[in-house]
A protein has these predicted regions:
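An N-terminal, well-structured beta->alpha segment
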Residues: 2-42
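Internal, active-site/partner-interface "lid" segment
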Residues: 133, 147, 173-201
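Alpha-helix boundary/capping residues
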Residues: 40-43, 95, 190
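Glycine-rich phosphate-binding loops that contact phosphosugars or nucleotide phosphates
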Residues: 45-176
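Residue-level preference for alpha-helix termini and adjacent loops
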Residues: 20, 27, 32, 80, ...
Length: 201
């Protein structure tokens, strides 16, 4: 059996992240969010990039977009400067996720997007950061603290980023009138696919 200290830390983690999501609504900007949704809904292609935990969350976002038939892909910062940004064309959208807003690996991607006429949506906690100031739209990522006792691991910050991604997808489903019948076609696998493709459901 693990120690009571460890169990208490686990319980506290739930509280920390629940508090974060609840408080995030206080930083919700209808104007910025509407602009982001409009750009994403009208883009032919969507890219997403970040480093570390932010990068992993961006991979999740790209899949969320594909699940509502918006062509998207995660662009690794390493591959981006070796031709990977060729995926994006004028009028497309690039998501840059960086809690501090100063991830140097993302600066070249920003420059390329600006040169190609690709709109940039930055998600960051620091609205005065370089990546925020150069973006077309900035979405605020609020983080109360990480769940570990040292406040160092990318835990709550990842949850906050994913919450923004989930909110974007939810809004886009409404804005584009995406139907479950469409999803059923591209998701025949697993329990979800079985439920979607079951007659009468």
């Amino acid at each position: 059996m693990v120690s009571e200290t460890a169990l208490n830390a686990a319980r506290k983690a739930y509280d920390i992240e629940a508090e974060c999501i609840s408080e995030m609504k206080n930083y919700f900007s209808e104007e910025a969010f509407s602009k982001a949704v409009d750009l994403l809904c009208n883009a032919e292609r969507i890219g997403a990039a970040g480093c570390g935990h932010s990068g992993i969350a961006c991979q999740h976002f790209a899949h969320l977009m594909c699940c509502i038939e918006r062509p998207a892909r995660f662009i690794s910062p390493a591959e981006a400067v070796h031709g990977g940004t060729g995926f994006l064309q004028k009028g497309d959208v690039m998501i840059l996720a960086s809690r501090g807003g100063a991830t140097k690996e993302l600066f070249p991607i920003l420059d390329i997007c600006k040169a190609k006429g690709v709109s940039v949506i930055t998600i960051t906690e620091n609205l005065q950061s370089p990546l925020a100031k150069s973006a077309d739209v900035v979405l605020k990522q609020y983080v109360n603290r990480e769940t570990d006792k040292y406040n160092m691991q990318g835990t709550t910050s990842t949850t906050a980023l994913c919450m923004i991604f989930h909110a974007l997808q939810a809004a886009m489903i409404e804005e584009t009138d995406y139907q479950k019948e469409q999803f059923a076609l591209i998701h025949p696998g697993g329990a979800v696919g079985e439920r979607l493709n079951k007659k009468g459901v």
